């Protein structure tokens, strides 16, 4: 956690179920959302993704914020959440996936997780008020 603090990270979105980073981050003043997620290749609920997106977008509203999204290996869960965050920021899904893969080449976008993000984005769009309303 010291390394993250030295890199200027202010917020951690922790997707690993194995361990809560909160106690390690507190002495460094880093805010943590522990959003424990099994890497079980089962569909993930939109509520799980929304919780992470809410935390990320609130963090990114702060001009000096640096957000770090992670899981245990950085292969499935963190990329899924990063994809949800970027889509919530109006990125096209395919472009977001390309960016994530460019930054983290070991990413494996499991179909079930990508579909979970698609469902989340779709439900988000349905719940947002339309400009004509």
Regions found by a protein language model. Give the residues of each.
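A phosphate-binding catalytic loop at a beta-strand-loop-alpha-helix junction
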Residues: 64-83
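Structured catalytic cores of enzymes that bind and process phosphorylated ligands/cofactors
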Residues: 113, 132-133
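Cysteine-based protein phosphatase catalytic domain of the PTP/DSP
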Residues: 1-66, 87-121, 125
């Amino acid at each position: 956690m010291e390394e993250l603090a030295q890199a200027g990270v202010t917020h951690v979105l922790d997707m690993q179920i194995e361990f809560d980073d909160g106690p390690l981050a507190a002495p460094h003043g880093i805010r943590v959302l522990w959003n424990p997620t099994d890497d079980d290749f089962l569909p993930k609920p939109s509520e799980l993704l929304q919780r992470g997106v809410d935390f990320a977008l609130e963090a990114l509203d702060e001009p000096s914020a640096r957000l770090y999204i992670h899981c245990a290996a950085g292969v499935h869960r963190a990329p899924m959440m990063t994809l949800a965050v970027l889509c919530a920021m109006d990125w096209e899904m395919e472009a977001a996936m390309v960016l994530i893969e460019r930054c983290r080449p070991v990413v494996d976008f499991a179909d079930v997780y990508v579909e979970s993000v698609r469902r989340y984005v779709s439900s988000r769009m349905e719940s947002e008020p339309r400009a004509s309303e």
